[in-house]
From Swiss-Prot:
Alphabetic keyword roster: Cell projection, Coiled coil, Cytoplasm, Cytoskeleton, Phosphoprotein, Repeat, WD repeat
The organism of origin for this protein: Rattus norvegicus (Rat)
Role according to the record: Plays an important role in centriole assembly and/or stability and ciliogenesis. Involved in early steps of centriole duplication, as well as in the later steps of centriole length control. Acts in concert with POC1A to ensure centriole integrity and proper mitotic spindle formation. Required for primary cilia formation, ciliary length and also cell proliferation. Required for retinal integrity. Acts as a positive regulator of centriole elongation.
Family: Belongs to the WD repeat POC1 family.
Major site of localization recorded for this protein: cytoplasm
Name of the gene: Poc1b
GO cellular component assignments: centriole; centrosome; ciliary basal body; cytoplasm; spindle pole
CDD domains per record: WD40 (cd00200)
Protein name according to UniProt: POC1 centriolar protein homolog B
Length: 477
């Protein structure tokens, strides 16, 4: 694959988090970016000019991972507070809280059909949840140290996980057994993911290396030694032909997987880079790190007519003869010092629209409509429908901020000045949240009254039946 006709360019950058950014993901429609941070908040950024950002408040410790549901109407997040949350992305702050892990949760990932969620934790376990039923399903135990990441395969039949025990494991979701194991004596993988076609996995190593494994042949295909510090995250381009990586050396690198070489080194962050993610259409990718900035990069990869890497092995692509290790290069670690293009970026100089870098932020305070645990295996206190109905009908939840804004006309365009607002925005949001809580309280009281009435009716029936029984006994005696 040749490099694209144009170099990657920095298109936008956002500031709003108060600490390092740990995870980022594009919405399926590519109109929003969600980010997680050490500041315990999630933020939702719109790629529309002058649109407001939303800060979701609910976790009590560092948010370690997040991901949009495939329908785009929900957002899952994991935290060091040992919980997983499932958010409805509106201004009401509805969320389900999943409690099952006994240690910080490091990773969340939806299956491609959105039916399941997999979580990985420092308690050495992997847990799978049903989104339809809002309940815990099962755990996977084989790792002997903290599990840092777990991902579904594109077809949902497999799960890949990596741990500080220096192993990468492949799990069958049907048998719930470990069916494959990759080990490395040098370091452990911080992050792992499937290629878009599901035949390979890529790992981001603490030993500074990026590795590509063929899970059909159980062999290492490519080994890139291009970073000078640990690799924290990676993301496949939707075509599967390239890979973007984030490292503690402060750089973002783009690898050509067909030719097996490094094509770009991007230097835009000050400090370690912790997360990177391609958009679903492959036109953008975002990065975040210790500098608390979200950088949005535009690529021209979609303009290039890629060759499918697997077509190099067409003669071997059948069950009797899978692709051979020697068919794919490089076969040994390469420093890739030659033909490397380094692009240094200063966000404040490269992005002219500085006003959009720090958009107005609306705080969304969470209230828990559902709590799900592995012990109850069901939602309590019985309001799973609050979140589940959004899962069943994505049309109930807007997929992008532009449709959210339709409910609030004042949210469109520039934020109104203080003399144009009779009530400050923060106060209005707080009042709206209080009203929502009062509505919930009213509904709860109504439900309690109904249950009391039902109990009284049942008690009355019991007394009548008891009286009849006594009458029958007296007649017989």
């Amino acid at each position: 694959m040749a490099s694209g006709p144009e170099d990657p360019i920095l298109e936008r950058y956002f500031k709003g988090h108060k600490a390092a950014i740990t995870s980022a993901d594009f919405s399926p429609n590519c109109k929003q970016i969600a980010t997680a941070s050490w500041d315990t908040f999630l933020m939702l950024w719109s790629l529309k000019p002058h649109a407001r950002a939303y800060r979701y408040v609910g976790h009590k410790d560092v948010v370690t991972s997040l991901q949009f549901s495939p329908q785009g109407n929900l957002l899952a997040s994991a935290s060091r507070d040992k919980t997983v949350r499932l958010w409805v992305l509106d201004r009401k702050g509805k969320s389900s809280e999943f409690k099952a892990h006994t240690a910080p949760v490091r990773s969340v990932d939806f299956s491609a059909d959105g039916q399941f969620l997999v979580t990985a934790s420092e308690d050495k376990s992997i847990k799978v949840w049903s989104m339809y039923r809002q309940r815990f399903l099962y755990s996977l135990y084989r790792h002997t140290h903290w599990v840092r990441c777990a991902k579904f395969s594109p077809d949902g039949r497999l799960i890949v996980s990596c741990s500080e025990d220096k192993t990468i494991k492949i799990w069958d979701t049907t048998s719930k057994q470990c069916v494959n194991n990759f080990s490395d004596s040098v370091g452990f993988a911080n992050f792992v993911d499937f290629s878009p076609n599901g035949t390979c996995i890529a790992s981001a190593g603490s030993d500074h290396a990026v590795r590509i494994w063929d899970i059909r042949m159980n062999r290492l295909l490519q080994h890139y030694q291009v970073h000078s510090c640990g690799v924290n995250c990676l993301s496949f381009h939707p075509s599967g032909n390239s890979l973007v990586t984030a490292s503690s050396d402060g750089t973002v690198k783009i690898l050509d997987l067909v030719e097996g070489r490094l094509i770009y080194t991007l230097q835009g962050h000050t400090g370690p880079v912790f997360t990177v993610s391609f958009s679903k259409d492959g036109e953008l990718f975002t990065s975040g790190g210790a500098d608390a900035q979200v950088l949005v990069w535009r690529t021209s990869f979609n303009q290039v007519h890629y060759r499918d890497p697997s077509k190099r092995n067409l003669k071997r692509l059948h069950l009797e003869a899978s692709p051979h290790l020697l068919d794919i290069y490089p076969r040994t670690p390469h420093g890739h010092e030659d033909k490397r293009e380094t692009i240094e970026i200063n966000p404040k100089l490269e992005v002219m629209d500085l006003h959009s870098s720090s958009p107005p932020v609306v705080d969304v305070l969470s209230f828990d409509s559902t709590t799900v645990t592995d012990s109850t295996c069901r939602a309590v206190p019985g309001k799973g429908e609050d979140i589940c109905r959004y899962f069943l009908n994505p049309l109930l939840m807007p997929e992008c901020s532009s449709t959210i804004m339709k409910k609030k006309p004042e949210d469109v365009g520039d934020p109104p000045s203080e003399n144009q607002r009779s009530v400050p925005l923060a106060v209005a949001d707080a009042l709206e949240h209080i009203m929502e809580q009062l509505n919930i309280l009213t509904q709860s009281v109504s439900i309690v009254e109904q249950r009391l009435s039902l109990t009284e009716d049942k008690l009355k029936d019991c007394l009548e039946n008891q009286q009849k029984l006594f009458s029958v006994i007296q007649q017989k005696s």
